[in-house]
Curated annotation (Swiss-Prot):
NCBIfam families per UniProt: infC (TIGR00168)
Native species: Elusimicrobium minutum (strain Pei191)
Name under which the protein is recorded: Translation initiation factor IF-3
Subunit architecture: Monomer.
PROSITE patterns hit by this protein: IF3
GO cellular component: cytoplasm
Chief location bin: cytoplasm
SUPFAM superfamilies, per database record: Translation initiation factor IF3, C-terminal domain, Translation initiation factor IF3, N-terminal domain
Cellular compartments annotated: Cytoplasm
Length: 177
């Protein structure tokens, strides 16, 4: 049985003889507009400069082509893509679980962890888990979450308020910008 690898969809850029339209809007290597030219004339001008004719905007009417070095163009496109990836915010959701009868020092340690996560710009979900008869005292868990929210107020906002699901009660903290 053959295993197929997932292929990434690449933006295909036509160059030189791959351009099959009769006329193109031509831009020179220094950025000056040369106007609408036939493809053969544009290819001739590109070969004179020992560069490639690259289709920049295939959807335009007529398509826009530029005379440039194709390998340099691909390098710059890759560089732009990497810069765009760097600029996108990467926020992760961290989850901390505690019991409703947690000791005060243990809660302090958990709050320190939450503060560290928030300083790294991560979102934090604090979950209080109730076991057995603890379900009768959900108000203690709710009070604990509100106390933590008050304590983290200078560095975090609460998103969505208090959420109750089954035997869990949670609150999501988002770092302030």
């Amino acid at each position: 049985m053959a295993r197929y690898e997932k292929q990434e969809k690449k933006d295909f850029v036509r160059k030189n003889e791959q351009i099959r339209v009769p006329q193109v809007r031509l831009i020179d290597s220094d950025g000056t507009m040369l106007g609408v030219k036939s493809v053969t004339e544009a290819l001739y001008l590109a070969k004179q400069q020992e560069l490639d004719l690259v289709e920049i905007s295939p959807t335009a009417e007529p398509p826009v082509c530029k005379i440039l070095d194709y390998s340099k163009y691909l390098y710059e496109q890759g560089k732009k893509l990497k810069d765009a990836k760097k600029k996108t915010a990467k926020t992760a959701m961290k989850e901390l679980r505690i019991k409703s009868r947690i000791a005060s020092h243990d809660l302090e340690v958990k709050i320190k962890h939450i503060e560290d996560f928030l300083k790294r710009k991560d979102m934090v979900r604090l979950v209080v888990v109730f076991h057995g008869r603890e379900n009768q005292h959900r108000d203690l868990g709710e009070q604990m979450l509100h106390d933590v929210a008050k304590r983290l107020e200078p560095i975090a906002n609460v998103e969505g308020g208090l959420q109750v699901t089954g035997n869990r009660m949670s609150m999501i903290f988002v770092p302030k910008n």
